[in-house]
């Protein structure tokens, strides 16, 4: 078996409008599909970031009362989403101007590249990495 690539990552959010604003209007994801699922009385939002072979889709499912995410101590499962950027410092400046707090920039001990973390509206850790 040979897997070609990651096709998409799916996340559950507690506030659909807040998540849509964050991922589309602040982080710049493109909307691929937006569907109201009548049988579940909720929305599903498919987003894309990147081009060609570097593109990845993010599926957002709205759940009005999901259990809280366990961040500390870390639990099994998805730890964080990481995004490659050309310039971590410039990207952090843009995020801060939009009111998004970022952790201090540091060097990844393995790649020796600059990196930092910030969080989505539900507390999902997001990483920027050069």
Give the residues covered by each predicted segment.
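Vicinal oxygen chelate
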Residues: 1-2, 46, 92-130
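Generic preference for hydrophobic
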Residues: 58-60, 128
């Amino acid at each position: 078996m040979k897997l070609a690539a990651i096709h998409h990552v799916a996340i559950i959010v507690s506030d659909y409008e807040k998540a849509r604003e964050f991922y589309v209007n602040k982080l710049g994801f493109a909307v691929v599909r937006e569907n109201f699922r009548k049988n579940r009385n909720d929305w599903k939002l498919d987003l894309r970031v990147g081009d060609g072979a570097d593109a990845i889709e993010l599926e957002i499912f709205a759940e009005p009362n999901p259990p809280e995410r366990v961040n500390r101590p870390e639990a099994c499962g998805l730890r964080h989403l990481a995004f490659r950027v050309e310039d971590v410092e410039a990207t952090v400046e843009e995020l801060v101007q939009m009111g998004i707090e970022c952790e201090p920039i540091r060097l990844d001990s393995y790649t020796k590249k600059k990196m930092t973390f910030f969080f989505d509206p539900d507390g999902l850790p997001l990483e920027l990495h050069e």
